[in-house]
């Protein structure tokens, strides 16, 4: 995917406010052709950063790329938010998409222009210090889309981090109403979990299988969960990947647990999470052995019935 322009900013409730502004160097900053007019032709160097005030006084920082693959041209976007978050903003300015802006829950919006013609808008709420992956509510018919890593580092402050291409990102317009429960199919929630920092693999496995699992299984049955699996992935088994390495098997996953929950309706799983026992015991128990700030969740995936027994689960 080729990225021609990205813009981030503060309280962008109106996309028209992103279209232009005066950069600090006095030059007018315009969007890519096909949006509001203007041209990026002839700009040098290929990657250019400009900061200024857009319509209504909204600060923004933009990155302009004239051609080139995203991963090749914008390697500077792959930054470590945690290590950078206490740096003075001036020191961080040489890195694209590295700046902070104030926000309140539900009021901050981020936007970018994909392929120089498409506006993507997503609402973000302030929250606890944790890295989050955001899916945008609408991608206006642009095909392959993008996503942004953001980190809430302090109340009212958010730091923007990596932007990367996410092929075949689904548009909300493609998702039919009620399609969370497709007829005749089960749903599967997949979780890639990490153990609590400082906890040994032995203690992690013991807590997961001997303490957490027994507390969970009866509740799963109560709410009609069809299958539940928790698979521990210790570091020693990852070394086996050395024997399977080839050009198609290069990247090694680092999660400690792979878990799947299969159910008929998403409402069943939601009701289980609302159960007083879950809130009082299971929710708190997760913090005792899991690094919940790093856990990754995959969208619900339909599975065809019937499901047979799952030995050892």
Swiss-Prot record:
Bias (Basic and acidic residues): 1-31, 45-56
Alphabetically ordered keywords of this record: Lyase
GO MF entries: lyase activity; oxidoreductase activity
Source organism, top-level taxon: Eukaryota
The protein's annotated pathway: Secondary metabolite biosynthesis
Annotated stretches, region: Disordered: 1-56
Annotated ranges, domain EthD: 197-292
Entry's family note: Belongs to the tpcK family.
Protein name (Swiss-Prot/TrEMBL): Decarboxylase gedI
Organism from which the protein derives: Aspergillus terreus (strain NIH 2624 / FGSC A1156)
Organism ancestry: Eukaryota, Fungi, Dikarya, Ascomycota, Pezizomycotina
């Amino acid at each position: 995917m080729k990225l021609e322009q990205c813009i981030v900013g503060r309280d962008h409730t109106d996309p028209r406010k992103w279209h232009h502004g005066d950069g600090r160097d006095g030059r007018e900053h315009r969007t890519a052709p096909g949006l509001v007019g203007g041209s990026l032709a002839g700009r040098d160097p290929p990657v250019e950063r400009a900061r200024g005030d857009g319509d209504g006084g909204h600060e923004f920082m933009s990155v302009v790329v004239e051609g080139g693959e995203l991963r090749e041209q914008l390697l500077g976007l792959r930054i470590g938010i945690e290590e950078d978050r206490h740096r003075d903003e001036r020191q961080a300015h040489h890195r694209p998409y590295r700046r902070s802006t104030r926000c309140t829950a539900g009021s901050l919006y981020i936007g970018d222009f994909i392929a120089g013609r498409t506006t993507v808008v997503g609402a973000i709420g302030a929250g606890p210090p944790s890295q989050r992956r955001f899916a945008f509510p609408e991608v206006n018919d642009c095909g392959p889309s993008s996503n942004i890593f953001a980190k809430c580092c302090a109340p009212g402050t958010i730091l923007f981090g990596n932007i990367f291409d996410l092929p075949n990102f689904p548009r909300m317009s493609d998702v039919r109403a009620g399609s969370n429960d497709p007829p005749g199919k089960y749903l599967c929630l997949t979780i890639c979990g990490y153990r609590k920092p400082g906890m040994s693999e032995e203690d992690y496995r013991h807590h997961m299988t001997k303490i957490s699992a027994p507390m969970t299984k009866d509740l799963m049955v109560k709410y009609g969960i069809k299958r539940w699996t928790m698979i521990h992935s210790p570091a020693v088994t990852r070394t086996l990947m050395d024997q399977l390495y080839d050009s198609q098997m290069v990247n090694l996953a680092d999660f400690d647990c792979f878990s799947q929950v299969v159910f008929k309706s998403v409402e069943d799983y939601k009701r289980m999470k609302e159960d007083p026992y879950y809130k009082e015991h299971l929710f708190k128990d997760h913090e005792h052995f899991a690094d919940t700030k790093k856990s990754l969740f995959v969208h619900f995936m339909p599975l065809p019935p019937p499901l047979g027994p799952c030995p050892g689960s």
